[in-house]
């Protein structure tokens, strides 16, 4: 017998209805898309690097994540569309920086979760 599933079917309608009501107002596609973008290791490395540096140019970021400038640029574009990073041009160089510092809280939460729960 599997102890991880119910042995009988019993629907708790009040709880199910409350949960469904809350879910109807939850923007699942956007939140899922946000986590999907951040689930890529290179994008996570980029965010981590930018959290610890005020700004980095694309060439520096490419070197840090050991990827081509084109690949790095693609990752940065995804992060920029998500509102995590922004950029500015200085002469011939394009610098990226963290746009919303709340991403730092999310990074810390991920690290703490891993250390406390997954250890």
Curated annotation (Swiss-Prot):
Signal peptide: none annotated. Keywords: Cadmium, Cadmium resistance, DNA-binding, Metal-binding, Plasmid, Transcription, Transcription regulation. Cd(2+) binds at residues 6, 10, 57, 59. One of its GO terms (biological process) is response to cadmium ion. It comes from the Bacteria. Residues 23-118 form the HTH arsR-type domain. GO terms for molecular function: DNA binding; DNA-binding transcription factor activity; metal ion binding. InterPro entries: ArsR-like_HTH (IPR011991), ArsR_HTH (IPR018334), HTH_ArsR_DNA-bd_dom (IPR001845), Metal_resp_trans_reg (IPR051011), WH-like_DNA-bd_sf (IPR036388), WH_DNA-bd_sf (IPR036390). Residues 58-77 bind DNA. Metal-binding repressor for the cad operon. Involved in resistance to heavy metals, such as cadmium, bismuth, zinc or lead. Metal binding causes the repressor to dissociate from the DNA. Homodimer. This is Cadmium resistance transcriptional regulatory protein CadC. It comes from Listeria innocua serovar 6a (strain ATCC BAA-680 / CLIP 11262).
């Amino acid at each position: 017998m599997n102890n991880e599933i119910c042995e009988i079917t019993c629907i708790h309608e009040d709880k199910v209805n409350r949960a469904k009501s809350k879910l109807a107002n939850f923007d699942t596609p956007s939140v899922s898309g946000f986590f999907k973008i951040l689930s890529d290791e290179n994008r996570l490395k980029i965010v981590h690097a930018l959290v610890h540096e005020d700004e980095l140019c694309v060439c520096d970021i490419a070197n840090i994540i050991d990827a081509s400038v084109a690949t790095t640029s693609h990752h940065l574009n995804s992060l920029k569309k998500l509102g995590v990073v922004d950029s500015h041009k200085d002469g011939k160089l394009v610098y990226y920086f963290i746009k919303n510092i709340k991403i730092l809280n999310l990074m810390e939460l991920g690290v703490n979760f891993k250390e406390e729960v997954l250890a």
